[in-house]
């Protein structure tokens, strides 16, 4: 298959996250390969936070898709009405109208609060949900950028505490994401982050969301590279055609 055909196929989320896309290693694989190799290859189970995050992304990047998102007018997920709605509509998830309202506010804030951020996201030449494939440490990798704009790879994140974002970025694997994306797209990466909590100003009228722009530093990306390299060493050890150890026979053996 030609490169252009691969990229076009990966634009479809079902292909990207399905069997076709799984022939490529992605950032979501790196944490397992590094810390729990036996989990490599397992699909990440869906959960409500994924659905809410997906809706936030679609409102900003793919508003036409957001119109098709399943939204139900009930008070909560742990209700009989919610479960009946899923069953009646053959769905595995839906978001409530209250959740949809809150996420719409978050998306509007992201798009309109800061003129530089707005210009970056809504640039005339910006590309959204752009896939890429390439080789890293001798193995095929894939990535899908939220936004390509003004010579940057831009990734949208939400967080419960923006003041811990820099520290948590290492824990959540954003450093490895930055390395992989910068390597494959050949351009620097920055994160646009929005807090999930709507807050009231202390000294003036009005409400706000915490919002931040976090360009990636060389140090941050290099640390990500080291983690990816370690992950790929484990891949070669357990899963390559020249594997030297069986993952089924592996136990943790580490001095304290």
PLM features: residue spans?
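Metal-dependent nuclease catalytic cores that hydrolyze phosphodiester bonds in DNA/RNA
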Residues: 1-142, 248-254
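Gly/Ser/Thr-rich active-site loops/lids in small-molecule metabolic enzymes
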Residues: 170-179
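Flexible, glycine- and charge-enriched loops at secondary-structure boundaries
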Residues: 167-171, 221
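Conserved catalytic cores of phosphodiester-cleaving nucleases, focusing on short active-site segments
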Residues: 143-165, 181
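Secondary-structure boundary elements
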Residues: 119-120, 150-153, 183-189
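Histidine- and/or cysteine-centered catalytic micro-motif in compact active-site loops
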Residues: 131-133, 152, 157-159, 194-196
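Metal-dependent nuclease catalytic regions and adjoining charged, substrate-binding loops involved
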Residues: 100, 105, 180-256
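Short acidic, glycine/proline-rich loop/turn micro-motifs
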Residues: 162-168, 210-212
